[in-house]
Regions:
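Histidine-acidic metal/acid-base catalytic patches
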Residues: 1-7, 14-31, 62, 90, ...
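N-terminal small/glycine-rich loop or linker at the start of catalytic domains
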Residues: 1-7, 69-80, 113-118, 217
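Active-site-proximal loop/turn and secondary-structure-junction residues that shape catalytic pockets
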Residues: 12-14, 37-39, 74-77, 113-117, ...
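Active-site acidic/histidine proton-transfer and metal-coordination neighborhood
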Residues: 19-20, 60-63, 67, 79-180
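Conserved beta-strand positions in the central sheet of alpha/beta enzyme cores
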Residues: 34, 70, 110, 150, ...
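Glycine-rich, proline-tolerant flexible connector loops at the mouths of alpha/beta enzymes
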Residues: 36-58, 113-119
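A short acidic, helix-capping loop that chelates divalent metal ions and anchors anionic groups
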Residues: 40-45, 77-82, 117-122, 189, ...
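Short glycine-enriched, charge-decorated loop/helix-capping segments at active-site entrances
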Residues: 43-49, 84-87, 125-126, 222-228
Length: 291
């Protein structure tokens, strides 16, 4: 039913416990997931993560029969200076997330692009350097576990919240193995253009999140919590641009939406999956020529 490179994030069903969410996703016909491990966003993975919790989560995932493309996690504000004890705790949490990624067969761990604040802790340049250094360190640790390290940048609610700041971080990461996760909703909410994002970051894009959004206006902030088709994201143009650069990575419906009820959510997810599958399969010019 769905394209083999299109998965569904467990965040799409964050109101359900993990086993139920995975059963729902599998029942819709998806074969691949992103595993949400974001405190305050999705509780499918305990924030206090120890070896026992890692084994428990991995067992639930294995039982589902679903492939895991990435674990979407957080180890705290990467642009915040920590004391020795806090650094040790962050390192321990990173190790547990990497262990979870490895035990679930994930290709990568995804980390954010800074704190949930547009204002830097110090200078913008200094904060970007700190975030970059932390991500590069995490990517080196990831190698020990046989997985990759990606960052979701830009992210509308974090330090690297627009295209310009995402570019600054990408520049800082030049020469590293850190991949970039492209999220249509965050790009649009920030006033950016998905096609421009693809042209800027090209083959550094390793994964794509799919959700709709509208940009900020004079009277309100951007809204990233819209079902596909209910916002202003040009998925046809963005996916066509990815195809044009030879993108061979995967896509994930991360439908953290607030415009449908929980009862409506499975049908809305299936509808989005069919729509995106068609766009992945057929070039934009083919769709336009048929209209």
């Amino acid at each position: 039913m769905f394209h083999q490179r299109l998965g569904c994030s467990s965040i799409s069903f964050r109101h359900q416990d993990l086993a139920t969410a995975l059963h729902t996703i599998s029942g819709l016909g998806f074969e691949e997931i992103d595993l949400g491990a974001l405190p305050g966003v999705c509780d499918h993975v305990p924030y206090v993560l120890d070896a026992e919790a890692v084994e428990a989560v991995a067992a639930v995932v294995r039982e589902s029969g679903l492939r895991v493309r990435s674990v979407n996690g957080d180890v705290g504000d990467l642009n915040t200076t920590l004391d020795a004890d806090a650094r040790l705790e962050r390192e321990r949490h990173l190790e547990m997330l990497l262990s979870l990624a490895a035990k679930t067969g994930a290709k990568a761990l995804v980390l954010p692009c800074g704190a949930t604040d547009h204002e830097p802790v110090g200078s913008l340049e200094g904060d970007i350097e700190t975030v970059g250094a932390q991500l590069i360190h995490a990517s080196e640790r990831a190698k020990e576990f046989g997985v990759e390290l990606w960052t979701e940048s830009l992210h509308y609610f974090r330090l690297c919240w627009n295209t310009e700041r995402a570019q600054l971080l990408a520049d800082q990461l030049t020469g590293s193995n850190v991949g970039i996760v492209m999220d249509f909703s965050h790009i649009v909410a920030s006033g950016g253009n998905p096609v421009d994002f693809v042209e800027r970051f090209g083959d550094r894009i390793t994964h794509v999140h799919l959700r709709d959004a509208v940009p900020a206006t004079e009277t309100g902030p951007g809204n990233i919590n819209l079902s596909i088709g209910n916002g202003q994201a040009d998925f046809a143009a963005g996916l066509s641009a990815l195809r044009d650069i030879g993108y061979t990575g995967h896509f994930s419906l991360e439908l953290e939406t607030r415009d449908v009820t929980h009862d409506e959510r499975p049908a809305a997810t299936a509808k989005a999956g069919i729509f995106i599958t068609d766009l992945i399969q057929y070039p934009l010019h083919t769709i336009q020529g048929a209209s």
